[in-house]
Amino acid sequence: MISKQDFPTINDRVPAGQKPNGAPYRVLVVDDSMFVSKQIGQILTSEGYEVADTAVDGVDGVEKYKAMSPGVDLVTMDITMPKMDGITALEKILEFDKNAKVVIISALGKEELVKKALLLGAKNYIVKPLDRKKVLERIASVLK
């Protein structure tokens, strides 16, 4: 006879946000919208990721990445921000750490900027409005 023990529970599944050693992947969220930063944070923490910090513009993001490196596994980077845009911040992070994993966050209609970011070295992109499944899939694919 089949019992409950024959079916793994959702609690037995290893969250996507955990490294093989059980530690969480650490993410720096760079976005000038507090709403978007909070939304990304909620999506990521629900899967076991740790939001290591947030930054409100490219300047802040680059400074925090440098200060926390190598303790950041991935950066989510908005393209359009004050002080320093996401493309420039991406370039500065990659100058500092050529192996940095940066995922660009973009509004619809910014395809040319997304292409530019990918050519410069961004590992993937996510389009706003955020879709939980796509956010998790794209981030997980970069961290594999």
UniProtKB/Swiss-Prot annotation:
<feature type="binding site">
    <location>
        <position position="31"/>
    </location>
    <ligand>
        <name>Mg(2+)</name>
    </ligand>
</feature>
<dbReference type="Pfam" id="PF00072">
    <property type="entry name" value="Response_reg"/>
</dbReference>
<keyword id="KW-0479">Metal-binding</keyword>
<keyword id="KW-0283">Flagellar rotation</keyword>
<dbReference type="GO" id="GO:0005737">
    <property type="term" value="C:cytoplasm"/>
</dbReference>
<dbReference type="InterPro" id="IPR011006">
    <property type="entry name" value="CheY-like_superfamily"/>
</dbReference>
<keyword id="KW-0963">Cytoplasm</keyword>
<feature type="binding site">
    <location>
        <position position="78"/>
    </location>
    <ligand>
        <name>Mg(2+)</name>
    </ligand>
</feature>
<keyword id="KW-0460">Magnesium</keyword>
<protein>
    <recommendedName>
        <fullName>Chemotaxis protein CheY</fullName>
    </recommendedName>
</protein>
<feature type="binding site">
    <location>
        <position position="80"/>
    </location>
    <ligand>
        <name>Mg(2+)</name>
    </ligand>
</feature>
<comment type="function">
    <text>Involved in the transmission of sensory signals from the chemoreceptors to the flagellar motors. CheY seems to regulate the clockwise (CW) rotation.</text>
</comment>
<dbReference type="GO" id="GO:0000160">
    <property type="term" value="P:phosphorelay signal transduction system"/>
</dbReference>
<feature type="domain" description="Response regulatory">
    <location>
        <begin position="26"/>
        <end position="143"/>
    </location>
</feature>
<dbReference type="GO" id="GO:0006935">
    <property type="term" value="P:chemotaxis"/>
</dbReference>
<feature type="binding site">
    <location>
        <position position="32"/>
    </location>
    <ligand>
        <name>Mg(2+)</name>
    </ligand>
</feature>
<dbReference type="InterPro" id="IPR001789">
    <property type="entry name" value="Sig_transdc_resp-reg_receiver"/>
</dbReference>
<keyword id="KW-0597">Phosphoprotein</keyword>
<feature type="modified residue" description="4-aspartylphosphate">
    <location>
        <position position="78"/>
    </location>
</feature>
<keyword id="KW-0145">Chemotaxis</keyword>
<keyword id="KW-0902">Two-component regulatory system</keyword>
<dbReference type="GO" id="GO:0097588">
    <property type="term" value="P:archaeal or bacterial-type flagellum-dependent cell motility"/>
</dbReference>
<dbReference type="InterPro" id="IPR052048">
    <property type="entry name" value="ST_Response_Regulator"/>
</dbReference>
<dbReference type="GO" id="GO:0046872">
    <property type="term" value="F:metal ion binding"/>
</dbReference>
